[in-house]
From Swiss-Prot:
Residues 44-56, 299-308, 799-808, 821-843 have a biased composition (Pro residues). Residues 228-257, 268-278, 309-320, 566-580, 844-863 have a biased composition (Low complexity). Residues 1-108, 123-324, 542-580, 606-630, 780-873, 1291-1318 are annotated as: Disordered. Keywords: Activator, ADP-ribosylation, DNA-binding, Early protein, Host cytoplasm, Host nucleus, Phosphoprotein, Transcription, Transcription regulation, Virion, Virion tegument. GO terms for cellular component: host cell cytoplasm; host cell nucleus; viral tegument. GO terms for biological process: DNA-templated viral transcription; positive regulation of DNA-templated transcription. It is found in: Host nucleus; Host cytoplasm; Virion tegument. Residues 133-143, 547-564 have a biased composition (Basic and acidic residues). ADP-ribosylated. The long stretch of Ser is a major site of phosphorylation. Only the phosphorylated forms are capable of interacting with beta or gamma genes. Residues 319-547 bind DNA. Residues 74-91, 159-174, 1303-1318 have a biased composition (Acidic residues). This is Major viral transcription factor ICP4 homolog.
Length: 1318
């Protein structure tokens, strides 16, 4: 119908339905208004009044759920109708200019009704957009909508004064009524919004109305105030009311700012027109836009005129404003762009799973307790959380109100009735309120609704309000908490404590006026039962305690065991996805919110300055200055590409290998490279090493989180879809920044996911690849496929996981794909060859430990009893469990020696990583839960430690270490990764092996991992029962605990040397019982004087010995403990040159094992001894002037023939106190320094370390004597930089006898300065 017909119909309905009330109001208007003023209006309903009526869509006041004049349903129909009539009369007065107090006769249209009709027509005329050239001030004011309540920051901008009225309901209602009426209130035209293109400036004060307008406002003000207060009360007290979702958008200060409305309301009229033309009735959108309804075939409405363009805003301000709008959209009842929306319920399937409870037992959302909610975080320094998401106010620390309230709160032991962040930790208040809610007969709901407050509490509340910058204390704007006793919700969101939501939900129920006392008691009992399992899991995870009753329902004893039986029958029990109680099996942060946070950190990583403009002290490593940084950036960029491949492979595994089903991947494109900031020139992304390292850290975090989410079945739920989209976005961002600079990889990629990552880095579309993968899946799954019409995929559903955990349908692609678990249409005949059922989801390796106890053959952490040297693992690590059948399948592989397989059984994390590397189980109902294990190169290297010592019972000493990036004991550089970066501050595997081999380690020596071409040979250590275990090795924690329990079972003690820094100790690391010998130390390259004091050339072969650094001091203690614990075993020989041999590139080939024995050298060099040595590869070493030692390693022919190729000179160890070391090389003087400068210890694989403790040990320095009468008498030493030095010119016929080693046990007894002590 047309606009006028609709309004006439409304007028007729209003006249017929409200004739008696209107007539009575006209005849006895003064008496009714006096009664309304006396009783307070509809805010105080009579006990005899019934429930609120259902809103009639044909009545104007109720047909505007989103307009904002009436925030909730009326509590009394008569009073509501009277208030609506008053509102209509108020708006009719400016249009008609006639009095409205004339009586109306029965059956005759009264002047009052004519005035109402005239106001409607006038409103319709004024809401039709017209392009006048200019408008005067009165028309501009008339076109403005009433200003809704504003946020504290807006009020501060408007310059309003703060009133010090108390924060009671009357003040709130008065303020709400004032803002509903408008500033200084004028009755503005309904539906008229500011021009969307107008500038966002504060509105000028409204002009005063004429005298008779004020007269009508005074006569109608009390009743309008009552209606407005009722709407504000109902809208704030009950968020579930029929009109609260839209009314709160007009009454909520955080959701209705002029900035938001100016940008978004322009699209309402077209959207409403489209909805109405499609057959819909006039809804909130049409009324909101202020455009009358029109017939389906009517012409489209004219577009509003374009005003002057708004001034340009900064991108940061625009982005922040849009983000705030999105955050407030859920509260305001708007969509993601800020437009008002009316929620349409979707079709809900109530199947047997939902009725039995199995559907709810399988519920997962992808989020992990303990990880911050996306967008939540701590407030800026000096501020506390206040208002909406991301808002804050200045802190009140030191204010007398806050200090007094804090002292009172700490002394009371009860929850504070008015809580502020200045009182202390929010966790304490949350814990007190939660415990109060579970205390019977405590009247918790009554306390939340109306707590007894002291004068100091009122003073604190007023002080917090004043410092927030708000002008008036309104009950409508977002404060983050519905009750003053409950802390701001942002603290629960930042901590990831979903259990803290109980206080807010209970307070919302307590503050509601829609329930009586008995109903609130029922709701509180419901909340207690619902939150009890969640609180039990979260609190147990925090305290490390076992969750009682498996985290199940706390009320299972009262006969509702039906909760478990049907669920157990319908859900697969071994799967982790079937049990929502095991969410803490994943570390905090490794969930959907953690992936989103990692994407935010990756996007916000700052750019660094170019290499040339940076500090110039980087040239002490391998390569100098900018060249070294560029080389490092290239290596890190390659690692970023590998991490991106890992992310897409994890996503592909999570969606059963179907890349087309990964959310967001079909339309993924490389993001534009980040632009340099305004600070100045920045290094390009591919050369920015610090930012690349930050990116690599976040990419690896995302990869690990996705793997854990896949193992738990969290990728196919709502939060998993968000995490997948965020992961694809992270890959796209890195691909756009690094793709143009990375070389093209010529090798064949092992998976389609890796190929997808490379296509992104090459700025190519993924659709052909996705089409190929879908086509390949079709050819494998359905050889005789159904007709094309039966398999056509056309689904407009959003990227959301299907219900019930069904496999995700593929995205749009150019090839067809079968719809998973889709039934054929009702009228279509099924195809002749039935298609096989979809492949079941991959089983999860880890579940929760069973309540009856773990199986001895299962996979779980065997924490040793009693006290321990290392920290205990978390409760989640102790609860992780792998079924015995899965353990047997995963460990039955020739890669794992049978004696070492129990170490895998002791480490559920290792079993989960093996399950992730398994292929999908073969179709056809095979008994195996996992497919064959893919024994890749990284897995082989991670499991190579099992072959150091064949039998676990032969292990006597375990050395734990943390390698540098790029160091690998199992492969050296054969793994293909980037070379390690030399560091003088932190030592890794290279320095550890050099100390065990009694030699120095430098960037140009064979001991440095950057020069390795293969895995070092440590078989000599394994033969002594010494096991080297890296924190990156497979089952690191399980191996240590297995060896400890095995030694305890054999009634012996294990010796554990922990050379891992505390910062590098892995989360949930191994537990070492105190019954074993334990020595903690560090690996420091700076103990070498050549690294610590490079200017002291006379000390370049000297090493500082200490009992806290991995070296001779620690070795002496280990050897003494070994001799005491194993008196019948051969003595340990830790610091010996024969312990370690390296594979490096030499003149005899790229994979030479050094130190090479003299016999091996002579056999290798024999072909060059036929007189043509100058033309051979050994010519430089056999030349007359060849240096004997290059970087302290045997090089010349005579040196190699005597000690072997690459045999190192032995260092001199000097024991200095800490104060002397801090004093510099000048502290080492006298005979010991002379000894260190002249001593030249010849290579000897069996010689013990030479330690100088004091000057008495410094005898005549040993020298190398050459027995050749025709050759050189001195020893020529060459450095990598080209310097040559000749030492020992005195000739001799034989080498003097070796100096006797120092008795280390005697030195330990005299260690008075703690160098070798505990």
């Amino acid at each position: 119908m047309s606009a006028e017909q609709r309004k006439k119909k409304k007028t007729t309905t209003t006249t017929q339905g409200r004739g008696a009330e209107v007539a009575m109001a006209d005849e006895d208007g003064g008496r009714l208004r006096a009664a309304a003023e006396t009783t307070g209006g509809p805010g105080s309903p009579d006990p005899a009044d019934g429930p609120p009526p259902t809103p009639n869509p044909d009545r104007r006041p109720a047909a505007r759920p989103g307009f904002g004049w009436h925030g909730g349903p009326e509590e009394n129909e008569d009073e509501a109708d009277d208030a609506a009539a008053d509102a209509d009369a108020d708006e009719a007065a400016p249009a008609s200019g006639e009095a409205v107090d004339e009586p109306a006769a029965d059956g005759v249209v009264s002047p009052r009704q004519l005035a109402l009709l005239a106001s409607m027509v006038d409103e319709a005329v004024r809401t039709i957009p017209s392009p006048p050239p200019e408008r005067d001030g009165a028309q501009e004011e008339a076109a403005r909508s009433p200003s809704p309540p504003r946020t504290p920051s807006m009020r501060a901008d408007y310059g309003e004064e703060n009133d010090d009225d108390d924060d009671d309901d009357d003040d709130d209602d008065r303020d709400a009524g004032r803002w509903v009426r408008g500033p200084e209130t004028t009755s503005a035209v309904r539906g008229a919004y500011p021009d969307p293109m107008a500038s966002l400036s504060p509105r000028p004060p409204a002009p005063r109305r004429h005298h008779h307008h004020h007269h009508h406002r005074r006569r109608r003000a009390p009743r309008r105030r009552s209606a407005a207060s009722d709407s504000s009360k109902s809208g704030s007290s009950s968020s579930a009311s029929s009109a609260s979702s839209s009314a709160s958008s007009s009454s909520s200060a955080s959701a209705s700012s002029s900035d938001d409305d100016d940008d978004d309301d322009a699209a309402r009229a077209p959207a409403s027109a489209a909805d109405h033309a499609a057959g819909g009735t006039l809804g909130a959108d049409d009324e909101e836009a202020g455009v009358p309804a029109r017939a389906p075939g009517a012409a489209p409405r004219p577009s509003p005129p374009r005003a002057e363009p708004a001034p340009a805003r900064t991108p940061a301000a625009t982005a922040g404003r849009l983000e705030r709008r999105r955050a407030r959209a859920a509260v305001a009842g708007r969509d993601a762009t800020g437009r008002f929306t009316a929620g349409r319920p979707r079709r809900v399937e109530l199947d047997a799973d939902a009725a039995s409870g199995a559907f709810y037992a399988r519920y997962r959302d992808g989020y992990v307790s303990g990880e911050p909610w996306p967008g939540a975080g701590p407030p800026p320094p000096g501020r506390v959380l206040y208002g909406g998401l991301g808002d804050s106010r200045p802190g009140l620390w030191g204010a007398p109100e806050a200090e007094e309230a804090r002292a009172r709160f700490e002394a009371s032991g009860a929850p504070a009735p008015v809580w502020a962040p200045e009182l202390g930790d929010a966790a304490q208040q949350y814990a007190l309120i939660t415990r109060l809610l579970y205390t019977p007969d405590a009247e918790a709901m009554g306390w939340l609704q109306n707590p007894r407050v002291a004068p100091g509490d009122v003073a604190l509340d007023q002080a917090c309000f004043r410092i927030s910058g708000a002008a008036r204390n309104s009950s409508s704007f977002i404060s983050g908490s519905v009750a003053r006793a409950v802390p701001h919700l942002g603290y629960a969101m930042a901590a990831g404590r979903f259990g803290w939501g109980l206080a807010h939900v209970a307070a919302a129920v307590a503050m509601s006026r829609r329930y009586d006392r008995a109903q609130k008691g029922f709701l509180l009992t419901s909340l207690r039962r619902a939150y009890a399992p969640l609180l039990a899991r979260e609190n147990a995870a925090l305290t490390g305690a076992r969750t009682p009753d498996d985290g199940g329902d706390a009320n299972r004893h009262d006969g509702d065991d039906a909760r478990g039986k049907p669920a157990a029958a319908a859900a697969p029990l071994p799967s982790a996805a079937a049990s929502p109680a095991d969410e803490r099996a994943v570390p905090a942060g490794y969930g959907a919110a953690g992936v989103l946070a990692a994407l935010g950190r990756l996007s916000a990583a700052p750019a660094s300055a170019p290499a040339g403009a940076d500090d110039d002290d980087d040239d002490d490593g391998a390569g100098g200055g900018g060249g070294g940084r560029r080389a490092e950036a290239g290596r890190v960029a390659v690692e970023c590409l590998a991490a991106c491949r890992g992310i897409l492979e994890a996503l592909a595994e999570g969606f059963d290998g179907d890349l087309a089903a990964v959310p967001g991947l079909a339309g993924a494109r490389p993001a534009a490279p980040p632009r340099p900031g305004p600070a100045g020139a920045a290094a390009p992304p591919h050369a920015d090493a610090p930012r690349l390292r930050a990116w690599l850290r976040e990419l690896r975090f995302v990869r690990d989180a996705l793997v854990l989410m896949r193992l738990r079945g969290d990728l196919r739920v709502a939060g998993g879809s968000e995490a997948a989209v965020a992961a694809v976005r992270a890959v796209s961002l890195v691909a756009g920044a690094l793709g143009p600079a990375l070389p093209r990889s010529p090798r064949l990629l092992s998976s389609a996911a890796a190929a997808a990552a490379d296509l992104l880095f090459q700025n190519q579309s993924l659709r052909p690849l996705l089409a190929d993968t879908v086509a390949a899946a079709d050819s494998l799954a359905a050889p005789a496929s159904a007709p094309r019409e039966a398999r056509k995929r056309k689904s407009p559903a959003p990227a959301r996981a299907p219900p019930g955990g069904a496999p995700r349908p593929p995205k749009k692609s150019r090839a067809d794909a079968p719809r998973p678990a889709a039934a054929p249409p009702a009228g279509a005949a099924p195809p002749a060859p039935p298609t096989p059922p979809p492949r079941p989801p991959r089983p999860a390796a880890l579940t929760r430990r069973p309540a009856e106890g773990p199986d001895p053959q299962g996979g779980w952490r065997r924490q040793p009893p009693g006290p321990s040297h290392t920290p205990a693992p978390s409760a989640a690590a102790l609860e992780a469990y792998c079924a015995p059948r899965a353990v047997a399948e995963l460990t039955d592989h020739p890669l794992f020696p049978a004696p070492w397989r129990p170490a895998l059984m002791f480490d559920p994390r290792a079993l989960a990583s093996l399950a992730a590397r398994c292929a999908a189980p073969p179709p056809g109902g095979a008994p195996a839960a996992f497919g064959p294990l893919r024994a890749s190169g990284p897995l082989r290297r991670a499991a190579a430690w099992m072959r150091q010592v064949p039998d676990p019972e032969d292990v006597r000493v375990v050395i734990l270490y943390s390698p540098l990036p790029g160091e690998d004991l199992a492969a050296g550089r054969a793994g293909g990764g980037p070379p390690p970066e030399w560091s003088a501050e932190r030592g890794g595997l290279s320095c550890l092996l050099a100390a065990l081999g009694n030699r120095l380690c430098g960037p140009a020596t064979a001991a440095w991992a950057g020069n390795w071409t293969g895995a070092p040979d440590v078989s000599a250590l394994g033969a002594q029962g010494v096991l080297l275990l890296s924190t990156r090795d497979l089952a690191f924690a399980g191996a240590v605990e297995f060896l400890g329990l095995l030694a305890g079972a054999c009634d012996r003690r294990l010796i554990v040397v922990n050379a891992v820094r505390a910062a590098d100790w892995p989360a949930d690391g191994p537990v070492v019982s105190r019954q074993h010998a334990y020595l903690a130390c560090e690996v420091l390259p700076a103990v070498q004087c050549a690294v610590r004091w490079p200017a002291a050339r006379d000390l370049r072969r000297t090493v500082l010995a200490s009992g806290r650094v991995f070296g001779p001091g620690v070795f002496a203690r280990v050897e003494a403990a070994h001799a005491r614990l194993y008196p019948d075993a051969p003595p340990l020989r830790l610091c010996r040159g024969a312990n370690v041999r390296y594979r490096v590139r030499t003149r005899f080939g790229p994979d030479t094992l050094v130190p090479m024995s003299p016999r091996e050298y002579r056999r290798a060099v024999l072909p060059a001894l036929d007189g043509r040595a100058a033309a051979s590869g050994a010519g430089d070493a056999m030349a007359p002037g060849a240096p004997d030692f290059c970087e302290d390693e045997a090089h010349s022919h005579r040196a190699c023939a005597r000690w072997g190729l690459g045999a190192p000179l032995r260092p001199v160890y000097v024991a200095l106190g800490r104060d002397a070391v801090r004093g510099g090389p000048a502290e080492l003087r006298g005979p010991r320094r002379e000894f260190c400068a002249r001593a030249l210890l010849e290579p000897d694989g069996d010689a013990p370390p030479l330690v100088l403790r004091d000057d008495a040990d410094a005898g005549p320095p040993p020298q190398i004597r050459w027995a050749s009468a025709a050759g050189r008498a001195g020893t020529v030493l060459a450095a990598a930089g080209g310097g040559v030095e000749v030492v020992g010119t005195a000739a001799g016929l034989a080498t003097p006898p070796r100096r006797e080693p120092v008795d280390m046990d005697a030195e330990l007894e005299d260690d008075d300065d703690g160098l070798f002590g505990e």
